[in-house]
């Protein structure tokens, strides 16, 4: 995508490479998504004025394995050219022209299986980093007798995956729960917001583990 670039290294590293913008200010310019080994790094460009530039020029300082198999510092200059995407011709509408365009939402992959493991937790992985969210718009309910009752939970930003949030709760074996998120609860860094989410599930009984 034009608002992201990625670096791939053949070996793990203890630290991230040092990146300096040569035709832009690199300070607070990126949301950095990296693997635990720092061998794959994605740089999400925050500012539309930056990723709409034809070319971004930057210097990259990192550790390089030389011919003696020793790690030595190396600096490269990179020129990142934005890929030109050909715009598709708008398709002719079969319906009335005054119908509104469908809303494009921020895509999210929710892990809340219908049969939840007693030691598992709910995860939400977004297609882009999240800029902000409304915690009051996130709900976890437990079915007590026939009544859905709100229960407290912990929501944490994943320490390794910048696009993932984890919801923790001490599940009651055999309990029935409903996870719900109101529309517009999460806003991505490029302006999209999420649609509403609602998923019901049941926690496995201890006896099911043999």
Task: Please identify what each model-predicted range represents.
Residues 1-210:
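N-terminal targeting or signal-anchor segments and their processing/structural boundaries
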């Amino acid at each position: 995508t034009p608002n992201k670039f990625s670096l791939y290294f053949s070996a793990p590293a203890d630290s991230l490479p040092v990146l300096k913008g040569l035709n832009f200010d690199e300070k607070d310019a990126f949301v950095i998504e990296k693997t635990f080994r720092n061998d794959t790094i994605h740089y999400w460009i925050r500012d539309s004025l930056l990723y709409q530039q034809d070319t971004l020029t930057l210097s990259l300082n990192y550790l390089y394995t030389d011919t003696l198999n020793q790690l030595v510092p190396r600096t490269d200059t990179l020129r990142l050219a934005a890929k030109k995407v050909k715009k598709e011709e708008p398709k002719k509408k079969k319906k009335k022209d005054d119908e509104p365009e469908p809303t494009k939402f921020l895509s999210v992959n929710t892990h809340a299986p219908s049969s939840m493991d007693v030691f598992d937790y709910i995860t939400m992985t977004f297609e882009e980093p999240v800029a902000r969210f409304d915690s009051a718009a996130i709900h976890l309910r437990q079915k007590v007798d026939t009544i859905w009752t709100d229960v407290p939970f912990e929501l944490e930003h994943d320490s390794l995956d910048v696009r993932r949030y984890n919801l923790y709760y001490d599940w009651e074996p055999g309990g029935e729960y409903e996870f719900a998120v109101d529309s517009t609860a999460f806003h991505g860094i490029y302006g999209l917001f999420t649609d509403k989410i609602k998923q019901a599930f049941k926690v496995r009984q201890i006896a099911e583990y043999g």
